[in-house]
Every structure is written in C-alpha cells, then in structure tokens.
Amino acid sequence: MYKRQRSLTALLERTPADKAIVVFGARQTGKTTLLEHLFQDRKVKWLSGDEPQDRELLTSLSSKADISILLSGLDVLVIDEAQRIQGIGMLLKRLEDSKPSCLIFATGSSSLELAGGVMESAAGRLWPMTLFPLSVSELADHNSWLDVMESLPIRLTVGSYPEIVTHPQRSKATLRYLFESIVFKDLFAIAGIRRSEQFLHLVRLLAANIGNPCSFSSLGQQCGLSSPTVERCVSLLEQSFIVKTLPCYCLLYTSDA
C-alpha cells in the first residue's frame, strides 16, 4: 500500500488544480482504501453511489448555494462508485466549477461512460487515472523475488487482485463474486444489457478464446447475437475491466486496415 500511496501522491502533485480526479479501476482493486490512506489526515467527506441517501443528496444539488454548503470546510470530497449516480458527468463539472479549494475525487468500478457520457459532459474538468490490480513490483515489495516468480503461474491464472493475493484459498469464490457484481450491478443495471443467457454465453466464448483471434460475426453466430450487439457487449466488458482487446498486428496501416 505504501508504494501505491507514494505513486498516487506523486501523480497528484502533477495534476492541475482545476480538475476533478476520476480514479477508474475494477472492483476490489483498492481505490477506496488507497484514498483513505492518502487523505487520513485531511478533512474528507465520503459519499457513495451505492447508498440511496447519498445518491439523493448529490442529485438534489440544484444551485451553487447547495454545492457551497456541501463543500464548506472540506479539504476533499470523494464520491465512491460514481457510475451509479445519474448525471454524474454534469455534477462533477458543477462541483469543480463551484469549489473554493476543495479537491474533488470520484471513483468508478466501471468506465463512467456506462453512466451516460461522463467524459463528454465534463470535458476539460476531469483528470482520469486508472488503478489496476497489484503489479509484480508491488508484490515484490512484500515478498522475495523467488516467491514472486514461484507464484507466477497462479498469478497468470487467477490474477493479482489484493483480496486474491491475501486470501488465495478463496480465489475462485472471489473471482465469481467480482464477476457477478460487475455483470449484475453495472452491465445489466446501468448499461441495460438484455438477453442475459446469450450475453453470458458470449463471456464464456471470450474466456475460451484468450489469446486467439476472434471476429464479432463469428462470436455472434455462436451465441445468437448480431455482430453490432457483440461489438457493443465486448466494448462494455472492456470498460468494466473484464476483458482487454488487442488489435491485429499490422506493419502497414491503410484506410482499409
């Protein structure tokens, strides 16, 4: 945690003072924990998109006076799980425009584009950062390099989410919980994904083809979805940090590439 806190502190020092900072990252990568450590000696107000009363408070800020009251006396305002708040993009813009000297932070366990074009709504007001699971160098901070190399096959299989690293015996259950949380809380609820059986079939097909070339049309034929629908689903999965797409290797880019 110390190394991550030190890295984020260095990033904050280079961040423009007139930007709200959005920390993206998959669920359980330590976004909230990191900010708690970073601002433990500051006056911070925490709000969460998972809490109905917090969502109601944020969506009811109808004037600059309301925003001034909310930010009064604060060093930092943190909005956790911001993608669940309706109109979060415009809200962040208004908060940033109205703040006196308060730092504005938002965290999102899926790309905030899922909430309706946040980056477009708050163009010029946001400074995005992405927090990934633990890196090899971070693991080596707390273990010997020999231990890290011996655990490499496991890391390549189940990943390096902090919960999985600290409780390896629960890795399968943790991954299942994270996947279901992302699918049912973010993709189905926020992005409006329907035809859940076909969607889950698509996810299984993608998992079975890791490292292999895939075409949207072929995947669509196998799971009963149209090619444009498959393309949208894959894009949403990537925004939610479930998959990572890699374009085909090409030496010569042309207009047809």
PLM feature spans:
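Pre-Walker A adenine-sensing motif
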Residues: K3-R14
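Short glycine-rich substrate-engagement loop in P-loop NTPases that contacts/grips substrate
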Residues: W46-S72
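Hydrophobic positions on the alpha1 helix immediately C-terminal to the Walker A/P-loop
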Residues: L34
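Structural recognition of the conserved hydrophobic beta-strand(s) that form the central parallel beta-sheet
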Residues: L103-S109
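Accessory nucleic acid-recognition modules appended to NTPase machines
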Residues: R176-S255
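Interdomain motor-coupling "hinge/lid" segment immediately C-terminal to the ATP-binding subdomain
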Residues: S109-S111, G116-A208, N212
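Conserved small/polar residues in nucleotide/adenosyl-binding loops
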Residues: M1-Q5, Y253-A257
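Conserved lysine of the Walker
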Residues: K31
